[in-house]
């Protein structure tokens, strides 16, 4: 196969993947009771990433919408386990809610590898949500690989911000 054919085939596959993706809608804000004013700041976790049962009841932990990963890893960090339990509880309590898990990677590695890594990261978050009682029918995993960086500098600090899954609540 010559280079031109390979390039055309890769472009065709990318076009097909983009054409098959769903349009993501922005989620409505988290519901709060009418007589309760929204909190101005997130309460400090009691230990590294842990929330108290009261936090789970007030949805304070739902503010964690970005899950970060280590370099070239798709394993969920322990500090995000409580956030997974909180989001799963939200999904259980609201069966009509839907969530898109947007997997991302830093710029290191090939485009194809990073697309796969972003998908594996999204699937890891999906599995954690399901293990905590979330329904697979409420979850949609999308991988953007290295295509949607939040930081464009070439530094470890910046790359760490790009190795993530973003949780987006979507309309039904």
Briefly describe each language-model feature range.
Residues 16-19:
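C-terminal motif of bacterial Sec signal peptides marking the signal peptidase cleavage site
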Residues 79-86, 112, 116, 120-124, ...:
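Extracytoplasmic/secreted proteins, especially bacterial periplasmic and envelope-associated proteins
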Residues 21-98, 172:
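Periplasmic peptidoglycan-binding/tethering modules of Gram-negative envelope proteins
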Residues 95-104, 119-150, 163-172:
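A non-catalytic structural micro-motif
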Residues 151-155:
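Short beta-alpha junctions and helix-cap segments that line functional grooves
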Residues 157-161:
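A generic structural micro-feature
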Residues 1-8:
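Bacterial N-terminal signal peptides that target proteins for export
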């Amino acid at each position: 196969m010559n280079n031109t054919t390979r390039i055309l085939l890769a472009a065709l596959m990318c076009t097909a993947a983009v054409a098959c993706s769903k349009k993501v809608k922005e989620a409505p804000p988290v519901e709060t009771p009418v007589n309760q004013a929204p909190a101005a700041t997130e309460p400090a976790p009691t230990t590294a990433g842990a929330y108290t049962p009261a936090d789970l009841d007030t949805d304070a932990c739902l503010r964690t919408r970005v899950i970060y990963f280590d370099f070239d890893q798709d394993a969920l960090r322990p500090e995000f386990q409580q956030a997974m339990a909180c989001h799963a509880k939200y999904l259980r309590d609201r069966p009509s809610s839907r969530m898109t898990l947007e997997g991302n990677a830093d710029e290191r590695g090939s485009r194809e590898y990073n697309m796969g890594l972003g998908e594996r990261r999204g699937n890891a978050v999906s599995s954690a949500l399901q293990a905590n009682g979330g329904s697979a029918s409420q979850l949609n995993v999308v991988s953007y690989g290295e295509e949607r960086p939040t930081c464009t500098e070439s530094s470890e600090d910046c790359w760490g911000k790009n190795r993530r899954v973003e949780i987006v609540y979507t309309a039904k």
